[in-house]
Every structure is written in C-alpha cells, then in structure tokens.
C-alpha cells in the first residue's frame, strides 16, 4: 500500500509544483495521511460487504503509522533505532541484518524488507527526499550517502555487491557535554578543564581517531563551550552536527552540506568549495565535520588567517600520524603542496591534536582520549610537536609533564586556566 500511495503523493506533489505551488514535507505528509484514510475506508467497505470484519481503530492507527514511516521515515530501520542502545546497523540484503549495541554486543536483527528489490526501492525513496538535493540510487549511481530523519547516517551500495548493502551509524550522545563525556569515562576532569579552556582561548583543534571513535560526539561537546551568539559555519559531506537543532546553545549557525553531481555530471559542490564559501560569511569559527581530501588546504588557510577557534576531524591511527595524513592530502590537492609547504601550513594553523581511541572490553566498547599533542613548529620534512597528555593502558590521559609553549600558556591564562594541572603526571 505504501508504494502505491507514495506514487500518488509524488504525482500530486509534481502537479502542485508545476502549477507554481510551494509544497513542504508537512504538506506531503498531510496529503498522504488523507489518502491512507480513504484507502482504509475503501478496504473496510469491501471487507464488510464480503462478510469480513473491519480493522479495529488500533489496527487502523498501526497501519497508518507503518505506511507513513515507510514513506517519510526509514521504516523498520527507525524501529530498530528506537532502541537507545543501538549504535550501528549493517544489512546484507533484506534479511541478513547485524545490529551493534553500545555495550559491545553484536546480534542478528529482524528482516527489514520483504525482498532485495523492495529494499532498493525503499532506499531510492529515501534518497529522493534527502537533504537539499535529490540523491539517486540505481545502476548508474550505485552508492547512497545520506542522513536519516532520526539523525543517523546511512550508506548503501548496490550493483557492485552480490546483494544490496546498507550501513547505518547513529550518534547516541548527540547533545553530550564535556562533563557528560567525563562522567562516561572518555577523560578525567584535568582533560575536561583543559579542553574547555582551549575552546575559550580560541585554539585551533584537530580531532583524530578511527571510525566510530567518537570524534563527532566530542566535536559537538567542544562546540558546546562556545558562546551561544558566536557565528559558526559548519561544513560537512552529510549533516551530522545539526547544531541548529540546539537553538539555545547555538543561535547563529550556517550549516553547509556538499552536493553530489547530477546525472549529467554537473552541479557538484565539494567540501573545498564550501570552505571557501564559508569564509565569506563572516564566521567566528569554521567547523569541518571531516577533512579527507583537498579541502584540507582551504581549511588550514582559514585557521591561519584569523578564524581562530576553528575545528575539524580527521581519520588517523595516532596523534602523531595526523601530520602524515595531512601531508598526503596536501600533495593530492590541486595545489600539489610538497611536504615542506604542507608542514609549514599545518604548523601555522593547528594548535592542538586530540586523538581518540576505542577498544572492546569485557564491559563493552570503551572510547577515550588517548593523546593530546601541541603543535610547535615546522622543521622541513618534520612537524615538531609535544605530547602534553597521554593515556597509559587502563587509565585516563594524564599530563606528561612537557611544558606548553609560552604563547599557548598566555592564551590559556587569559581565559582563567593555569598550566600545568596539579595532579600526578605520567612518567
């Protein structure tokens, strides 16, 4: 039923737009609800005439909600994600569904679609109404990358795998504060106080770690330390930060999202282009959700040219490994910066690198800040840095006893923070 009604809603929408009417998502949902009621009434009249009992009001409501979920939500995926402990969902075809939980469990979940064809069709409908531009999903566009209405991130592929595959990642702690991350064991009060002061002092911060290490969650928490009236420009492949949803905490936010090319290969807007656009919008801070290509150069330029307090995330296997990763991105960018030039740009732009680690423990998945490194200078083919916090096995990151640069200490002192922390240091 949902497919037929979806086609009817799409036809009504297209006709309305063609006649010059503005059609919102709420308008489409309202129209769909009225169509569903009409269909159910027709079914009830037919069943009664055939001597079959009609649906109860509760069953009617369940059918209406299921149809609306299928058309405007993510269907069964939404029902899985309703469990607050669910972190990841990975489906191989319609019926091989793995669910990963926050406590470390990984279990087979329920079948999500009746067939692989229905799975592809549902994903195609999700892409058609995703973000600010329709995203295709077919043999000519074999990957789909979008954000679900619930805020979870979905990636799907077809035609290049034996069966269509879907991976969904959800940020369970969308509004976590530094204090809440401290209480959950991500770091102790010394790191909490240092990071909060670093944000207030407008140090440029790069968050690093592997997939699912908690980089976006920590980035949101750091941004929670900014003044509510600061103008933030966020730049992402897919909107995950969603700072505008927290209007009391972030009152002046411009959220920018990259756009894929259309079927003619036109209309693409890259992260690098968005960074350049964002710099023209009077930002107080520029935030790049994930640096992974040529956007690294305009981002570093933004950090070194007056947009102090900017932040971004990057995939890396260690805090020191970030420097090699950025150099690789710089040499692949259109500017083709060599290692010496990229190191000089990085050293003039980034103040701190915060590295997050993760590991499976008997009590579940643990995520923690494993290292904080201060960038000191560029020395030809090497970036000089000091590891100022380090986590030993089984412990929180603690001060290493290495002093900060005088310039950094002055900026921190100006916001009321005294270095070094007074607790015991790691030897």
Where does each model-flagged region fall?
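P-loop NTP-binding catalytic core
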Residues: 99-201
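Conserved lysine of the Walker
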Residues: 215
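Switch/coupling sub-region of P-loop NTPases
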Residues: 203-205, 221-347, 357
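NTP-binding/hydrolysis catalytic cores, primarily Walker-type P-loop NTPases
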Residues: 361-427
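N-terminal accessory targeting/assembly segments
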Residues: 1-137
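Hydrophobic positions on the alpha1 helix immediately C-terminal to the Walker A/P-loop
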Residues: 218
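P-loop (Walker A) phosphate-binding loop of NTP-binding proteins
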Residues: 198, 210-211
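Active-site phosphate-binding and catalytic loops of NTP-dependent enzymes
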Residues: 72-82, 126-147, 230, 333-340, ...
């Amino acid at each position: 039923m949902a497919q037929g009604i979806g086609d009817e809603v799409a036809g009504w929408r297209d006709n309305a737009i063609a006649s010059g009417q503005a059609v919102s998502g709420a308008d489409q949902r309202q129209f769909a609800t009225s169509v569903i009621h009409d269909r159910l009434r027709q079914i009830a009249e037919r069943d009664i005439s055939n001597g079959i009992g009609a649906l109860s009001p509760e069953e009617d409501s369940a059918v209406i909600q299921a149809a609306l979920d299928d058309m405007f939500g993510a269907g069964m995926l939404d029902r899985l994600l309703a469990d607050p402990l669910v972190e990841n969902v990975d489906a191989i075809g319609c019926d091989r569904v793995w669910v990963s939980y926050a406590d470390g469990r990984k279990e087979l979940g329920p079948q999500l679609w009746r067939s692989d064809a229905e799975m592809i069709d549902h994903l195609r409908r999700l892409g058609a109404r995703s973000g600010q531009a329709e995203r295709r999903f077919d043999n000519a566009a074999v990957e789909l990358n979008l954000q679900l209405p619930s805020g979870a991130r979905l990636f799907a592929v077809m035609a290049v795998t034996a069966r269509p595959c879907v991976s969904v990642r959800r940020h369970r702690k969308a509004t976590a504060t530094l204090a809440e991350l401290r209480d959950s064991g991500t770091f102790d009060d010394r790191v909490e106080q240092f990071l909060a002061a670093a944000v207030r002092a407008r140090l440029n911060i790069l968050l690093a770690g592997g997939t699912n290490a908690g980089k976006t969650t920590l980035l949101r928490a750091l941004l929670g330390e900014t003044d509510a009236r600061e103008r933030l420009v966020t730049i992402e492949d897919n909107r995950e930060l969603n700072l505008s949803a927290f209007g009391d905490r972030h009152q002046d936010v411009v959220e920018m999202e990259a756009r894929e090319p259309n079927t003619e290969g036109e209309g693409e807007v890259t992260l690098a282009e968005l960074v350049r656009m964002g710099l023209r919008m009077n930002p107080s801070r520029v935030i790049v959700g994930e640096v992974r290509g040529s956007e690294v150069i305009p981002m570093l330029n933004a950090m070194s040219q007056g947009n102090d307090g900017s932040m971004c995330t990057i995939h890396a296997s260690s805090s020191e490994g970030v420097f090699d990763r950025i150099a690789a991105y710089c040499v692949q960018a259109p500017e083709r910066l060599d290692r010496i030039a990229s190191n000089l740009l990085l050293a003039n732009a980034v103040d701190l690198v915060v590295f997050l680690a993760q590991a499976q423990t008997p009590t579940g998945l643990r995520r923690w800040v494993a290292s904080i490194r201060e960038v000191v200078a560029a020395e030809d083919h090497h970036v000089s840095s000091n590891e100022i916090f380090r986590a030993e096995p089984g412990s929180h990151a603690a001060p290493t006893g290495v002093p900060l640069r005088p310039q950094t200490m002055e900026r921190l002192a100006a916001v009321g923070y005294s270095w070094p922390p007074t607790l015991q240091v790691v030897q």
